[in-house]
Amino acid sequence: MAEPSQAPNPVPAAQPRPLHSPAPAPTSTPAPSPASASTPAPTPAPAPAPAAAPAGSTGSGGAGVGSGGDPARPGLSQQQRASQRKAQVRGLPRAKKLEKLGVFSACKANETCKCNGWKNPKPPTAPRMDLQQPAANLSELCRSCEHPLADHVSHLENVSEDEINRLLGMVVDVENLFMSVHKEEDTDTKQVYFYLFKLLRKCILQMTRPVVEGSLGSPPFEKPNIEQGVLNFVQYKFSHLAPRERQTMFELSKMFLLCLNYWKLETPAQFRQRSQSEDVATYKVNYTRWLCYCHVPQSCDSLPRYETTHVFGRSLLRSIFTVTRRQLLEKFRVEKDKLVPEKRTLILTHFPKFLSMLEEEIYGANSPIWESGFTMPPSEGTQLVPRPATVSATVVPSFSPSMGGGSNSSLSLDSAGTEPMPAGEKRKLPENLTLEDAKRLRVMGDIPMELVNEVMLTITDPAAMLGPETSLLSANAARDETARLEERRGIIEFHVIGNSLTPKANRRVLLWLVGLQNVFSHQLPRMPKEYIARLVFDPKHKTLALIKDGRVIGGICFRMFPTQGFTEIVFCAVTSNEQVKGYGTHLMNHLKEYHIKHSILYFLTYADEYAIGYFKKQGFSKDIKVPKSRYLGYIKDYEGATLMECELNPRIPYTELSHIIKKQKEIIKKLIERKQAQIRKVYPGLSCFKEGVRQIPVESVPGIRETGWKPLGKEKGKELKDPDQLYTTLKNLLAQIKSHPSAWPFMEPVKKSEAPDYYEVIRFPIDLKTMTERLRSRYYVTRKLFVADLQRVIANCREYNPPDSEYCRCASALEKFFYFKLKEGGLIDK
């Protein structure tokens, strides 16, 4: 986007001229330029009737949410008051309307009269009394020029009622802006209000429509806009997810866009306090555009209004994202009790992660989502289904149909169920199936999703969970829990930075690199400072920086070798007064996710004796799987240090892993409690210990088997410890199963063309081709996973097809065969 060479200076922070003073002749007021700063304006006179100010004053509030009725729509109450005021004046008798317009109309008695507006000889003594006073007579003389009112409104005699009402709407907006200029404390904002005030006055005078002209340009100011970029981000990052999870991300994106459209930006003065000087001029241009085209028109609807996310792009988003993200997350955290339970988890758990991933694409150097020709053809079943992403009526309003994503081409969630089923044997499970038959079809360990969702609502509902406040960390909380919470609240930030010669790194990055050099030098005293400085500022090295309160408190310096398939970790440190807070673990987790994104799945590092413990906790091992030929001569060797390796799993969301495990444990605990509540029988206590018995087998405890407990001792002994041996065994077994005559229905995934509703009935589809791919990718780390998938192949077939079908007969034959082979290979009990 081509930006103006300098920020516009709308007009000086002078007061507007009195409402009855002469106004300039032109209708389309050019957007103010710096040259206008030398032209003072007269002191204002009282407004005819005070009205609501434009949505959300920005002078003292800064960036954040206004104090309107709806916390997500700053200024909504001002907008309502303005609408009510306009409805009042439009309902006045025509004589009263002409009187109000006469106040803004020049006298036409003769060419020598310079009166720019009729002054009532009997002005109202109190605010809003002008509506209660009787209409002035057209013959009533002006207090200033002593010409009758008729000479001021003669041009309105043959004007339609609709045009009169349009002009009256601008009158109310002028009154609003007049009050805003008085109330506003910020100089830049006051200047824009004053400029718009003059523009609307001239439009009333000349009966034209307002047009903002000058160096600001006209919308849209950037392409692609913010909305398109965010939707590209969802497609780019989440198209591989299941439809339900992908729809969740889509709804989060729409919620973010909606909040951004009603968010109040910080003033240029506030922006200047936290940013480097070269960014301020560009931000001031965008801020002025935002006021003129987006913010003020929310309540002054005489001005054309545009959505922030439709007319701005990456430039503005880069300027505001960090502070907006922090304030938005803090707002939702404070108002979490206002959220409906099913949305609380969505916002408090998934939204922070969503914003973190979006931040990487906003500030990343080569993100494809901002390319004008971004295309990512969706695979089968990856199209997003636009739905109103309402979170709560008290927090985020429902989406307008005019926003992107609500086209007629959207998929219907119920469309698949209405298609006629082609002729064939496959059909749903008969309704008359007995309970015992249904139990037999289930794969061991399956839990109904309805039950899991119910438990999730319980453990995320503060009212349903007794005990201490969840925001207080327990003694056995995960190491990175504190850091994760601080990141969600915007207290800490993570940025991948590095020195650059072409183009030259900006000032903020250079300051952070100096801070990193100081942290590494202080925490690694045995490492020469010159050596640290050389690597930190080397353009080939990057650093994941941990930022708190605008300063660097830690980081991991690394060098990527994409052609060799690994990254070397060079330095890793957190400043001493910020340690033992989980920052080191969270740093490493962010680094892992960054490398998964760039398809590098191995870390190598030389750890000294003090760092070995830390790296072991982060999943590093002294067992090096990367061939020596791939790293020899590439990485730096240190005397007395130990080479360690960490292999990354691309399926693991590392920054949320401990939180996910915690949630899984809570779910299991609640499910166990529900299971225990279903067991009505109460057994007497054990008396054997009174007789001197010190220990008994667990299986001898009365009622233990009824709870679902099973002895695990025998199964543990059969687990193959050697991964290569397990892989070979399972590979041979799967090959025998695939060659069985009855395996033909299960060789490949079921095609939708053959069974349109299959994936609605079967929640966890599996087939022998998928199992082969999983085996090849070393998914089956235990034989239990392999056996479970085999069982699910059979269970899915029996659930979807009638018992007497050919498919079920094949399933039964194959089941007997593979159980025989499993027993023969010693993989299950005989």
From Swiss-Prot:
Function: Protein lysine acyltransferase that can act as a acetyltransferase, glutaryltransferase, succinyltransferase or malonyltransferase, depending on the context. Acts as a histone lysine succinyltransferase: catalyzes succinylation of histone H3 on 'Lys-79' (H3K79succ), with a maximum frequency around the transcription start sites of genes. Succinylation of histones gives a specific tag for epigenetic transcription activation. Association with the 2-oxoglutarate dehydrogenase complex, which provides succinyl-CoA, is required for histone succinylation.
Organism: Mus musculus
Record note on quaternary structure: Interacts with EP300, CREBBP and ADA2. Component of the TFTC-HAT complex, at least composed of TAF5L, TAF6L, TAF3, TADA3L, SUPT3H/SPT3, TAF2/TAFII150, TAF4/TAFII135, TAF5/TAFII100, KAT2A/GCN5L2, TAF10 and TRRAP. Component of the STAGA transcription coactivator-HAT complex, at least composed of SUPT3H, KAT2A, SUPT7L, TAF5L, TAF6L, TADA3L, TAD1L, TAF10, TAF12, TRRAP and TAF9. The STAGA core complex is associated with a subcomplex required for histone deubiquitination composed of ATXN7L3, ENY2 and USP22.
Keywords: Acetylation, Acyltransferase, Bromodomain, Chromosome, Cytoplasm, Cytoskeleton, Isopeptide bond, Nucleus, Phosphoprotein, Transcription, Transcription regulation, Transferase, Ubl conjugation
Cellular compartments per GO CC: ATAC complex; centrosome; histone acetyltransferase complex; mitotic spindle; nucleoplasm; nucleus; oxoglutarate dehydrogenase complex; SAGA complex
Entry superkingdom: Eukaryota
The gene coding this protein: Kat2a
Tissues/organs with expression: In brain, highly expressed in the hippocampal CA1 region (at protein level). Also expressed in the hippocampal subregions CA3 and the dentate gyrus as well as in the cortex and prefrontal cortex. Expressed at low level in the cerebellum.
Post-translational modification: Acetylated at Lys-542, inhibiting the protein acetyltransferase activity. Deacetylation at Lys-542 by SIRT6 promotes phosphorylation at Ser-302 and Thr-728 and subsequent activation of the protein acetyltransferase activity, leading to acetylation and inactivation of PPARGC1A.
Protein's name in the database: Histone acetyltransferase KAT2A
Family, similarity comment: Belongs to the acetyltransferase family. GCN5 subfamily.
Binding site for acetyl-CoA: C572, A573, V574, Q579, V580, K581, G582, Y583, G584, T585, Y610
GO MF, one example: DNA-binding transcription factor binding
PTM annotation (Phosphothreonine): residues: T728
Annotated knockout phenotype: Lethality during embryogenesis: embryos develop normally to 7.5 days post coitum (dpc), but growth is severely retarded by 8.5 dpc and embryos fail to form dorsal mesoderm lineages, including chordamesoderm and paraxial mesoderm. Differentiation of extra-embryonic and cardiac mesoderm is not affected. Loss of the dorsal mesoderm lineages is due to an increased apoptosis. Conditional knockout mice lacking Kat2a in the excitatory neurons of the adult forebrain display impaired hippocampus-dependent memory consolidation as well as impaired synaptic and nuclear plasticity.
Compositional bias segments (type: Basic residues): 83-94
Protein's cellular compartments: Nucleus; Chromosome; Cytoplasm, Cytoskeleton, Microtubule organizing center, Centrosome
Coiled-coil regions listed: none
Binding site for succinyl-CoA: C572, A573, V574, Q579, V580, K581, G582, Y583, G584, T585, Y610
Active-site residue list: E568
Modified residues (Phosphoserine): S302
Catalyzed reactions: L-lysyl-[histone] + acetyl-CoA = N(6)-acetyl-L-lysyl-[histone] + CoA + H(+); L-lysyl-[protein] + acetyl-CoA = N(6)-acetyl-L-lysyl-[protein] + CoA + H(+); succinyl-CoA + L-lysyl-[protein] = N(6)-succinyl-L-lysyl-[protein] + CoA + H(+); glutaryl-CoA + L-lysyl-[protein] = N(6)-glutaryl-L-lysyl-[protein] + CoA + H(+)
Protein EC: 2.3.1.48, 2.3.1.-
Composition-biased stretches (Gly residues): 58-69
Renumbered residue ranges of the record's region Disordered: 1-94, 398-426
